[in-house]
UniProtKB/Swiss-Prot annotation:
Subunit structure: Homodimer.
Gene Ontology BP term (one): purine ribonucleoside salvage
Disulfide bonds: none
Record-given protein name: Xanthine phosphoribosyltransferase
InterPro entries membership: PRibTrfase_dom, PRTase-like, Pur/Pyrimidine_PRTase, Xanthine_PRibTrfase
């Protein structure tokens, strides 16, 4: 998506060679009209896949996942990183956050992910693939079908997407980055 690439180049901040800050429009401050356009683009790429639910993980994936779900006219559910005391009947998966340097358990209430669903996973970033693997695990636990994943920004050099594609998973990415360093971003 050219508009996204242009925004990344104009507003993104590369920290080291592995971290891309896009907090002016995606991860802290949100540009709602732009989020809706990205959501429509991802929804269009999965049109006809029979999707009945969109799944993401809190927090930065929620805005785009909601935009995708709105375009598909289906509900969105997000995995929580802290299980509420009121939740007992949940699917759980452990993921490792390289950004935060910690493992967390993500949970989804079983009542929001029935076995007859066809799920599209949506997230803001795909790097090592830990969050995506955890969400795939939750979908598998539920017995639901998995249509694939829609990703806003994929860092190809961190190989998470390649590993999941090798397992047969369909992943659609709006902006794929081959490499980056301060002052330079190279798209695929």
């Amino acid at each position: 998506m050219q508009e996204l690439k242009d925004r990344i180049l104009a507003e993104g901040e590369v920290i080291g060679t592995h971290i891309l800050k896009v907090d002016t429009f995606l991860n802290h401050q949100i540009d709602p009209a732009f989020i809706l356009r990205m959501g429509k683009e991802l929804a269009d790429r999965f049109a006809g896949a029979g999707i009945t639910r969109v799944l993401t993980v809190e927090a930065s994936g929620i805005a785009v996942a909601s935009a995708v779900a709105l375009s598909l006219n289906v509900p969105v559910v997000f995995a929580k990183k802290k299980q509420a005391s009121t939740q007992s009947d949940v699917y759980t998966s452990q993921i490792y956050s390289f950004t935060r340097q910690e493992s967390v358990n993500i949970t989804v209430s079983k009542k929001f992910l029935p076995a007859d669903d066809v799920v599209l996973i949506v997230d803001d970033f795909l790097a090592h693939g830990e969050a995506l693997k955890g969400l795939v695990d939750i979908v598998r636990q539920s017995g639901a079908g998995l249509a694939g994943a829609g990703i806003v920004i994929e860092k190809l050099f961190q190989r998470g997407g390649a590993a999941l594609r090798a397992e047969g998973m369909r992943i659609e990415t709006l902006a794929a980055i081959e490499r980056m360093e301060p002052g330079k971003i190279v798209f695929a």
